[in-house]
């Protein structure tokens, strides 16, 4: 046959149209099976069978298109038709094929438009295609105590994904608030701002482990990929790497060479050391939630056991240093010697693994929380972000450092970026609220604080800021009491990191009673119970003597004040540069009528932590000095300090509305200079 005639005949018999129709339908069926089969747990082999069958069916379909035509009477062999009927049949066949092609193409276009249409978060932000949240993995082990192991697998996969710059990966602190398998994925992705979620389960029995994972396009509620892994426990690192790589491939994320290396890197080759490490991680999460010193101690013990098994386990070494710095910041300050040891530990982790993001965070915390060397801390946090672009912790710490440097706009920008990666973490809006409060932007502070408490009703920063945006912004004591009634009743609302002036020493709950001039209730709040570690700790030890001073009843607390003074003086000998101890001692000395020593302690605290070094706590420490001066007869100096505080961002402690209602200023309230402050203006903004 002449080739030209052959191709003409192919066209005449609608074979070309049939080929196009078959290709379009085959593509649609392939997409359909890859989306639907995993939903019913149909093995991947079935999908491969469909693809192979469609490929093998193509030449058969082309032969049938050559041999047969559609006619009004049905399907008939082309050779059996007379010329007129054949022409009608070919036209009918062509129309049918056109309808098939157009119909399937419309379905394909609709599917693509739906999948690619930009979704939006609750805040109205566009959700990127390459975004994912790794939901908590379900523990299917018969031993329910193996939950720590399932959590650890999830966290390690998430950590590997966080190193991919081309992906948006939600932090674990946000995903931890959801169930392993959410019934309403569309709500989840709107709240988290992602297009995809990874669900999984872990079953551990002896030295065997089964990991089931499935990647879901949550907007369309379709499965992109699913797989089961049955491995020895010692091979679990390979599973974590494979899952992360499969997800990156499924979402078409571009990997830089260093990112590919990080995905393939195992934290240790010792499975028992890894198990001990995961137990430490579980305890560390509990410690950060409860702020109980014993939880931090248990976490450190597990990390040390892991390091004993594998002395080169850099991740465990870094996390040990991180845990110790968290304890230092939230619970009890380290001595200079202890701090030097933690610094050595963190640096050792980086020496073992220079590209370990967690190591850079640990060293950064030593510089930030330990030595207040802000530039060095920022350098470490930036390095961590380069290694793990989705690490919300590094962003949060960077924002906090910039805030202490008084770089308010940059601080807020970084907190907002952190909020995109950690949208359900209450600390982020609470920190934003605190920043606005310091800037005396009361409405913005109120709004952010309420957002924080919506996420977590027990968030200390949110409670403190919401209460003080009212008291400092409007001076409305009744509204403040109403706000207080919404807080957990057992919480005195104290925080060591806020330990700057008398309000922080006494705590927000008791201090509201003081503002109401109800001193007996304030004292009752601090009655030490049989099992009350806070009242007996450095955090609350000076509260009762300080309340007696404000009540004008210092004489009744001499014995207690002498005992507390002895404890704090011993602590100061161990940690001579701790401003928290000095501010508390200043009030104890006032209670003991040792005014000169009270002034000396308060001034020493301001020298250690001036505003120039800390734009958040510095004004609070200076406020404490003004309070001590007001009670020690140094009226002129107290007013001078207050004048300065009203002219800079210091809304956490000082505002005109607060000066009008706070009993701490009663000793100088009738002074003309103080009254002039009340009639003046206050600085608002950066």
Briefly describe each language-model feature range.
Residues 1-118:
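An N-terminal, helix-rich hydrophobic module
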Residues 4, 36, 90-548, 553-562, ...:
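Acidic, proline/glycine-rich low-complexity intrinsically disordered segments
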Residues 13, 164, 310, 353, ...:
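Acidic-histidine catalytic/liganding microenvironments
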Residues 485-490, 642-650, 682:
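TPR/TPR-like (Sel1-like) alpha-helical repeat modules
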Residues 538-540, 578-588, 614-630, 657:
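Amphipathic alpha-helical protein-interaction segments enriched in hydrophobic
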Residues 586, 626, 638, 668, ...:
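Hydrophobic, well-ordered secondary-structure elements that form the walls
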Residues 629-660:
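C-terminal structured "cap/appendage" subdomains that terminate the fold
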Residues 657-686:
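Terminal, low-structured helical/coil segments at or just beyond the last alpha-helical repeat
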């Amino acid at each position: 046959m002449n080739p030209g005639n052959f191709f003409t005949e192919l066209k005449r018999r609608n074979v070309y149209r049939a080929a196009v129709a078959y290709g379009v339908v085959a593509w649609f069926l392939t997409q359909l099976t890859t989306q639907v089969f995993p939903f019913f747990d149909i093995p991947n082999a079935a999908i491969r069978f469909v693809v192979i069958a469609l490929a093998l069916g193509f030449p058969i379909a082309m032969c049938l298109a050559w041999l047969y035509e559609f006619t009004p009477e049905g399907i008939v062999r082309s050779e059996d038709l007379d010329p007129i009927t054949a022409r009608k049949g070919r036209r009918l066949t062509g129309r049918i094929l056109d309808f098939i092609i157009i119909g399937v193409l419309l379905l394909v276009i609709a599917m693509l438009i739906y999948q690619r249409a930009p979704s939006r978060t609750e805040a109205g932000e566009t959700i990127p295609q390459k975004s994912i949240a790794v939901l908590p993995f379900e523990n299917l082990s018969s031993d329910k105590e193996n939950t720590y192991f399932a959590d650890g697998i999830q966290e390690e996969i998430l950590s590997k994904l966080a190193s991919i710059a081309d992906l948006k990966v939600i932090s674990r602190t946000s995903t931890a608030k959801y169930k392993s398998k959410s019934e309403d994925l569309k709500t989840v992705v709107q709240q988290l701002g992602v297009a995809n979620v990874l669900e999984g389960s872990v079953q551990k029995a002896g030295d065997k482990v089964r990991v089931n994972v499935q990647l879901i396009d949550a907007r369309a509620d379709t499965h992109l990929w699913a797989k089961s892994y049955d491995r020895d426990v010692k091979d679990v690192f390979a599973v974590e790497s494979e899952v992360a790589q499969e997800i990156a491939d499924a979402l078409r994320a571009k990997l830089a060479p260093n990112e590919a290396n990080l995905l393939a890197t195992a934290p240790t080759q010792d499975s028992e050391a890894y198990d001990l490490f995961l137990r430490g991680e579980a305890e560390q999460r509990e410690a950060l939630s409860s702020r109980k010193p014993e939880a931090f101690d248990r976490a450190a013990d597990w990390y040390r056991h892991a390091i004993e098994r594998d002395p080169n386990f850099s991740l465990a070494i870094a996390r040990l240093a991180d845990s110790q710095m968290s304890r230092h910041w939230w619970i009890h300050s380290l001595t200079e010697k202890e701090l030097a040891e933690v610094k050595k530990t963190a640096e050792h982790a980086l020496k073992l693994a220079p590209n370990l993001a967690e190591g850079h965070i640990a060293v950064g915390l030593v510089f930030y929380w330990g030595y207040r060397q802000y530039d060095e801390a920022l350098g470490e946090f930036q390095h961590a972000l380069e290694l793990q672009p989705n690490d919300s912790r590094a962003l949060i710490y960077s924002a906090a450092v910039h805030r202490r440097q008084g770089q308010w706009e940059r601080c807020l920008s970084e907190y907002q970026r952190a909020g995109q990666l950690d949208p359900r973490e209450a600390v982020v809006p609470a920190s934003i609220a605190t920043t606005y409060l310091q800037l005396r932007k009361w409405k913005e502070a109120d709004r952010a604080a309420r957002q924080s408490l919506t996420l977590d009703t027990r968030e200390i920063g949110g409670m403190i800021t919401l209460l003080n945006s009212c008291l400092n912004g409007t001076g409305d004591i009744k509204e403040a009491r109403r706000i207080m009634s919404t807080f957990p009743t057992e919480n005195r609302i104290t925080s060591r990191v806020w330990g700057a002036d008398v309000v922080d020493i006494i705590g927000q709950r008791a201090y509201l009673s003081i503002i109401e001039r109800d001193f007996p209730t304030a004292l009752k709040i601090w009655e030490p119970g049989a099992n009350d570690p806070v009242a007996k700790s450095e955090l609350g030890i000076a509260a009762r003597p300080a309340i007696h001073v404000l009540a004008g009843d210092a004489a009744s607390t001499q014995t207690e004040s002498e005992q507390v003074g002895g404890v704090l003086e011993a602590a100061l000998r161990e940690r001579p540069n701790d401003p928290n101890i000095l501010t508390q001692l200043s009030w104890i000395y006032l209670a003991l009528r040792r005014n000169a020593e009270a002034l000396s302690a308060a001034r020493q605290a301001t020298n250690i932590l001036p505003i120039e070094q800390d734009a958040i706590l510095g004004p609070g420490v200076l406020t404490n000095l003004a309070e001590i001066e007001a009670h020690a007869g140094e009226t002129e100096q107290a007013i001078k300090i207050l004048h300065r505080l009203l002219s800079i961002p210091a809304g956490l402690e000082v505002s005109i509305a607060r000066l009008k209602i706070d009993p701490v200023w009663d000793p100088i309230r009738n002074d003309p200079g103080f009254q002039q402050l009340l009639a003046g203006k206050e600085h608002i903004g950066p």
